[in-house]
A protein has these predicted regions:
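Pyridoxal 5′-phosphate
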Residues: 1-411
């Protein structure tokens, strides 16, 4: 890592030397907003509105149903899947784009359990994002298996010959802790179990090597660091070595070997095509396809280096200038994703006061202010100034305004 950033002057110097500075122009960024919530919803890429207009006006409006062939709608899920695959270390033909993360979690968990019959336990992280736990719980109930919840560091305590699969997230959604995916995957395989990773908080924010670590399956969303927009389709990775035998539970017509033969019985398509389910949301996929252009020419190593520098700067600032605030994100850069979680009393009210000042982060119950860092469109100076704003909000007590205590439906 470069020298720590400990002043506004050093933040300015870091911006002047930033190899990713050019990428900021690839986004629509509102004036006066420090957007530190890219770990929840990424900013709008400049190319997306034109892509949506083209798809709606010319393709849908003029070419109508011919667009499935003439404009490549049919091949979008696999083509976008390969583009995402390139960002998560997956060779072509192993990632399919479509549906929601919850759906893809169900697909992956049930499929891996079926690939490893005779074992009765599914393991997930008790601190995992709720949908990961809910889907794992439902899958276990459906399959007549036991669900065991355990934090990744405690995995060796429960991993045994009865474990069918382990389903963890690469980055903890609350604290931003990055788990050692290579070591965990190796331990899981050593017990004869299979490994699934949720990369929702990793894809696009840091280099990941699904093939390299030997993952069996993975899922992820595309509206965070991939900037695909609200409700953008998710994706699933199935390692090539499993594709001939994997039995995915949701056997929709588009995953059939011959979808337009309209046969009454299901015969899976070869390769990753069998991971298709139903008709893809073309408008959302076109938006995502255009959004992925922001990564053209970008080295994920540069993204990672800037992310670590930004998160380090924020934690150093919190330690030095924010009494009563605890950064619960790991200091070790090898254990940190692309966010910082600040634990404090009245975190919800503080978050709302920051938003009113143009600093957008988010709140996670019970007491965390999360700040997410998307290196492609944030500057060091912008983040430094955001921390100064947090210092002012806490020092002035303005967060005590009763208006900031009103809970909205989405926090």
């Amino acid at each position: 890592m470069p020298e720590p950033i400990v002043s506004r002057d050093s933040a300015i110097a870091a911006d002047e030397a930033d190899p990713l500075a050019y990428a900021r122009a690839r986004f629509v960024l509102p004036d006066g907003i420090a957007y530190l919530d890219g770990n929840s919803l990424g900013a709008l890429p400049v190319a997306v509105p034109a892509a949506l207009d083209e798809t709606a006006t010319r393709e849908w409006g003029r070419d109508l149903i011919a667009s499935w062939n003439a404009n490549g709608w049919w091949t979008l899920p696999a083509r976008i899947g390969d583009r995402i695959g390139a960002l998560v270390g997956a060779a072509p033909g192993q990632v399919m784009c479509g549906d929601s993360t919850s759906v893809q979690l169900f697909q992956a968990i049930v499929a891996l359990a079926r690939l490893n019959p005779g074992r009765g336990v599914i393991i997930t992280d008790g601190g995992n994002f709720p949908t990961d736990q809910y889907i794992a719980e439902s899958a276990a109930r459906l399959l007549g298996m036991q669900l065991v919840r355990v934090s990744p560091p405690d995995l060796p305590r429960v991993l045994d010959a009865n474990t069918a699969l382990v389903a963890f997230s690469a980055v903890d959604y609350r604290t931003g802790e990055l788990w050692d995916s290579r070591a965990i995957t190796a331990a899981v395989h050593g017990s004869g179990a299979l490994m699934m990773w949720d990369l929702a908080h990793a894809a696009g924010a840091l280099p990941f090597e699904l093939d390299g670590i030997g993952a069996d399956a993975a899922v992820g969303c595309s509206y965070k660091y991939l900037n695909g927009g609200p409700g953008a389709p998710a994706w699933i990775y199935v390692a090539g070595r499993h594709q001939a035998t994997v039995d995915l539970p949701l056997t929709g017509w588009q995953g059939h070997a011959a979808p337009f033969a309209l046969e009454p019985g299901y015969a899976p398509a070869p390769g990753i095509e069998r991971a298709r389910i139903g008709t893809p949301p073309v408008l959302s996929m076109r938006a995502l396809d255009a959004a992925l252009d922001v990564f053209d020419g970008v080295a994920l190593a540069d993204v990672r280096e800037k992310s670590l520098a930004l998160t380090d700067m924020v934690m150093r600032y919190a330690d030095a200038a924010l009494p009563g605030v605890l950064a619960v994100t790991p200091r070790d850069p090898q254990r940190r994703g692309s966010q910082v979680a600040l634990q404090m009393p009245n975190a919800y009210e503080v978050t709302q006061a920051l938003i009113a000042r143009g600093v957008v982060g988010d709140f996670r119950t019970p007491d965390l202010l999360r700040l997410g860092f998307a290196p492609l469109y944030l500057t060091y100076t912008q983040v430094w100034d955001a921390m100064e704003t947090l210092h002012q909000v806490l020092g002035s007590g303005e967060w005590q305004n009763p208006a900031f205590a009103a809970r909205a439906a989405v926090t």
